[in-house]
């Protein structure tokens, strides 16, 4: 006689209720002790073989967001290490309350949004530094100085200065791999930066990448999700926009990985938010030129889009084209350059339909052009 599988017991999920409880708990602690506990938590990597992900940094930064975007109770008390760990564990366990998190029909998509949430803190240091260096090359050497002009008009600092100062802080963050949090005394970075860039440029740079201690609550409040949607669990932390906390004595870095990721994402984010499709169109052309310059170094036969169009005209063919064709003896590679950056919905959704719709005019379009 064949055994029948036991029916699954459906447990009522209560994400919203548990978030409210966590926020209520957080509001009973003073801000300074919470940030101190978070800084201390990242001074030791719990499992070096797993890296900083073993400290659950995505949970810590969500706790920071909720802590500073909710009003304090009238009487607050200092937070200790046990209190902090309890909050982090409760936030980690929230994933059990997220609708469809363990959906058997969407296993890969469900795992995907969880992995995206964590990979920010797992990127190799070399990759983070290379990303910053490549960006400097793209924005400062292409399109006739357009990116530098529009960036300087808005923020009062050249891209050259931004990337050089960012490289300084990125390298500083690589000195001690055994700690994720760091403190840089004001006298140290001023001695290194003022002689080369001057006081005004350093100030404008810090205005761009740091938030003052007494402005932390105002900054975090701008990211508050009043509806407490489950998607908030997977979003990038607000500190991606301001990776430094500025105090009179120096700069506090809560996460070196987040710092390096922020420094390399800030410029494209600011340009995209300010100039929208105009920026995207220009950057797409930059990427096409950059890829072309790399392909030209290959010994292979490279056919550009311009040459492809010419061949089409000669043969009276009407069809879409890719940007490059690379011909080898063993086969042909079709390359189409697309300046694609996944939006928030793509990052946190586990709906195949929603992801497909969002990628229809970018990634999927490029694949179809290559097939045609």
Go through the PLM ranges and name each one.
Residues 1-21, 221-227, 232-233, 315-343:
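Long, acidic, intrinsically disordered low-complexity segments
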Residues 1-90:
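Long, charged/polar, low-complexity intrinsically disordered N-terminal extensions
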Residues 9-13, 19, 36, 44, ...:
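Residue-identity detector for threonine
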Residues 24, 31, 36-43, 66-69, ...:
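Interfaces and regulatory segments of ATP-dependent nucleotide/adenylate/phosphodiester-chemistry enzymes
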Residues 267-372:
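Catalytic core segments in nucleotide and nucleic-acid processing enzymes
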């Amino acid at each position: 006689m064949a055994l029948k599988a036991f029916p699954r017991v459906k447990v009522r999920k209560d994400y919203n209720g548990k978030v409210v409880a966590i926020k209520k708990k957080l509001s009973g602690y003073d801000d300074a002790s919470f940030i101190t506990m978070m800084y201390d938590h990242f001074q030791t990597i719990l499992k070096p073989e797993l890296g900083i992900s073993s400290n659950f940094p995505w949970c810590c930064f969500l706790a920071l967001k909720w802590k500073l975007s909710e009003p304090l109770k009238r009487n607050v008390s200092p937070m200790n290490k046990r209190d902090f760990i309890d909050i982090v564990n409760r936030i980690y366990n929230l994933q059990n309350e997220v609708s469809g998190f363990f959906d058997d029909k969407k296993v890969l998509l469900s795992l995907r949004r969880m992995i995206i949430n964590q990979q920010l803190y797992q990127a190799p240091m070399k990759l983070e530094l290379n990303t910053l260096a490549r960006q400097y090359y793209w924005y400062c050497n292409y399109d006739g100085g357009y990116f530098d002009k529009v960036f300087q008009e808005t923020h009062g600092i050249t891209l050259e200065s931004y990337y050089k100062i960012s490289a300084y802080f990125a390298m500083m963050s690589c000195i001690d791999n055994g700690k994720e949090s760091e403190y840089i005394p004001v006298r140290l970075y001023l001695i290194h930066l003022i002689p080369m860039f001057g006081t005004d440029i350093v100030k404008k740079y810090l205005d761009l990448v740091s938030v003052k201690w007494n402005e932390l609550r105002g900054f975090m409040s701008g990211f508050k999700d009043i509806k407490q949607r489950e998607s908030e669990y997977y979003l990038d932390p607000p500190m991606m926009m301001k990776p430094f906390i500025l105090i009179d004595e120096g700069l506090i870095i809560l996460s070196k990985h987040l710092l390096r990721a922020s420094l390399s994402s800030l410029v494209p984010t600011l340009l995209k938010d300010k100039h929208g499709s105009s920026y995207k169109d220009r950057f797409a052309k930059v990427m096409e030129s950059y890829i072309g310059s790399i392909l030209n170094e290959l010994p292979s036969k490279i056919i550009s889009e311009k040459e492809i169009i010419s061949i089409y005209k000669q043969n009276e063919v009407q069809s879409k084209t890719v940007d490059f064709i690379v011909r080898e003896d063993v086969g042909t590679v079709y390359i189409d350059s697309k300046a694609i950056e996944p939006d928030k919905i793509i990052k946190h959704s586990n709906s195949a339909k929603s992801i497909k719709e969002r990628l229809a005019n970018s990634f999927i379009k490029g694949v179809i052009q290559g097939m045609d």
